[in-house]
């Protein structure tokens, strides 16, 4: 069973910041499909970004993005047309993980997300629908939203469930700080900045 990990000091060599974008509409479409797969590799000691993985994914069940999805994610149809399938992207992720030394048993790394949706719901749900295995490294993660609540007891949460730390003003020099939702922007920027504040 997948489990959310806490953030012990200096336990991890690398933090892998991840934030999927997926097909969506109002009312919600089923199944949702991942259309953007970004990962930032942060050094656990320096908190500097050492490497990035970024690919768009061609949705199979609902190949045409809705106007709602484009408005919400900033991803247009041309960004996903002709892109690899989720299976192919997962193979590329595994190759990237190996190239970065993240599959070495002596290297401790963990994914970091804002919420449990990405790795508890979205990825395993789509993999189950498509009959694809889920790699073990996706089965444990740090939910930074929940972790921030634990580390900031007594502070009021934002109405959307985020704590004020995640919405605190960020210096303009913060990498990926800005309004563009994609690629490697938006929540990825907030996650990276917040993680640096913690560690």
What residue ranges belong to the model's regions?
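Glycine-rich, highly charged phosphate/nucleotide-binding loops
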Residues: 81-95
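Short acidic, Gly/Ser-rich segments with clustered Asp/Glu that frequently serve as metal-coordination loops
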Residues: 20-28
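Short glycine/proline- and acidic residue-enriched helix-loop micro-motifs
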Residues: 75-80
